[in-house]
Amino acid sequence: MLGVEYLLKMQYKNGGFPQYFPERKAEAYSSQITFNDNAMVNALKMLRDVAVENGRFQLMGVEKGLRKKCQVAYERGLQCVLDCQIRVDEQGRVLEYGTEAWKEGHRTVWCQQHDKVTLAPVKARAYELPSYSGMGETCGILELLMDVENPSEEVSEAVRCGVEWLESHVMKNVMLERFTNEEGKKDVRLLEREGAEPLWARFYDLEHAEPMFCDRSGVPRKKLSEVDYERRNGYTWVGNDPQKVIDRYRGTK
């Protein structure tokens, strides 16, 4: 159970989890609340499962005291997830966490990373800018929330708003093609294709909620073709994972 104790130690008071613990000074983003690669989601799943008396860890003889600590940490983390969900006003402008406007704002989805204090969307690596997460981390978060037994009204609203946001930001009639470019290298590009399966971008800009791409220059691009070869082919920019989440949600209604 040393790993569980480690998770309990690294959790912030607001319920968030950093990417690394202890913090890596050379990487400023390592201490931010991290949903990237499902880091926080997986941590919460572990705490949730340990907290269950007759769960998958029962044969390990988890002490009651530790189970209780895990339950408290899980609930605190779940609240942090809800608090990090980006909220906007009627004009689609991102609202600051904790303000009166934020309390009345409309829930959307999440960023890959959020500030460990303000909970605002923040950047990580040069090509991971503050943004709405479409095909990536938002999916894992929504699945975590849909797994909550006897969900509160807040959890239910968070899921509903997240799914609706994904449904309204699908990239229609677009397909990802893998091809050999003029230099004889394997490459990727987005093409218009009538009737193509729905796709979602990994990132959507915070101003207009439109698909956004980037490379190590840190300059946001509107088109994948504008990203340099190395990052264009070295990162997953689009995908259809949200469809599974949408289908699961709609199938339970």
Protein language model regions, located:
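Active-site cradle of extracellular carbohydrate-active enzymes
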Residues: L2-M40, L47, G61-S131
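Terminal, non-catalytic domain-edge segments
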Residues: K45, D49-Q79, V117-L129, S133-K253
